[in-house]
Amino acid sequence: MSVVIINTGCSNLSSIKYAICRLGYNPKISTSVRDILSANKILLPGVGSAYSAIRVLSESNLLNIIKKCQQPFLGICLGMQLLSAFSSEAQGLDLLSIINSPVYRLNSGSLPLPHNGWNNVEICRNNVLFEDIENHSKFYFLHSYSVDITKYTIAKTLYNTYFSAAIQKNNFW
C-alpha cells in the first residue's frame, strides 16, 4: 500500500513520516501529481500560514488534483483547514472548497492565542477515523484559526467556544 505525504513546504514532515513508518508503511513525501494520483492514501499536513501552503499547492499544480482525489485523504492541522472554502487569514483567502465551511480566527475570548495544549475531543458521530479511540480522548492543538461546527464535523473540542476537531466529506477527512 502506498502512502503519500503532500509537501506543503510548511509542516513537520519528518514527524508525520516517522509516525506513518511506525505503522508499517513506507510513505513518500512528494508534490508529484503522478505520486499523488497513484497513492492508496494521502496525507496533507500543515503548520503555519494557510497562504503559504495554498501558494505551494498552486505552484505545484495540485489544487484541482487534490479536489479530484478518490482515495482516502487526511488533512492534518492546517491541512484540515485547507479543505475548507475560505480562510479569514491574510485579509481573506480562497482554499480548496472541498468542505463548504469557512476558517476563522479562533474566538478565544480571554484565553490566549494561539491555542496551545491538550484538549479532550468529543466524537460527534461514529467514523472510521476514530475507530478504537475512546470518546473524550486528549489530542494536542496548536493553532489560531478554526473550522466552525458544520454538518461535516465528526469531532469537536472546546476552547472558549466549540470548533471542529475533525471533519469528513466523502473520502476527505
Curated annotation (Swiss-Prot):
GO terms for biological process: L-histidine biosynthetic process. It is found in: Cytoplasm. Residues 2-173 form the Glutamine amidotransferase type-1 domain. It catalyses: 5-[(5-phospho-1-deoxy-D-ribulos-1-ylimino)methylamino]-1-(5-phospho-beta-D-ribosyl)imidazole-4-carboxamide + L-glutamine = D-erythro-1-(imidazol-4-yl)glycerol 3-phosphate + 5-amino-1-(5-phospho-beta-D-ribosyl)imidazole-4-carboxamide + L-glutamate + H(+); L-glutamine + H2O = L-glutamate + NH4(+). Its main location: cytoplasm. Keywords: Amino-acid biosynthesis, Cytoplasm, Glutamine amidotransferase, Histidine biosynthesis, Hydrolase, Lyase. The active site is at C77 (nucleophile). InterPro entries: Class_I_gatase-like, GATASE, Imidazole-glycPsynth_HisH. GO terms for cellular component: cytoplasm. PROSITE patterns: GATASE_TYPE_1 (PS51273). GO terms for molecular function: glutaminase activity; imidazoleglycerol-phosphate synthase activity; lyase activity. Its EC number is 4.3.2.10, 3.5.1.2. Pathway: Amino-acid biosynthesis; L-histidine biosynthesis; L-histidine from 5-phospho-alpha-D-ribose 1-diphosphate: step 5/9. Heterodimer of HisH and HisF. IGPS catalyzes the conversion of PRFAR and glutamine to IGP, AICAR and glutamate. The HisH subunit catalyzes the hydrolysis of glutamine to glutamate and ammonia as part of the synthesis of IGP and AICAR. The resulting ammonia molecule is channeled to the active site of HisF. This is Imidazole glycerol phosphate synthase subunit HisH. It comes from Buchnera aphidicola subsp. Melaphis rhois. The gene is hisH.
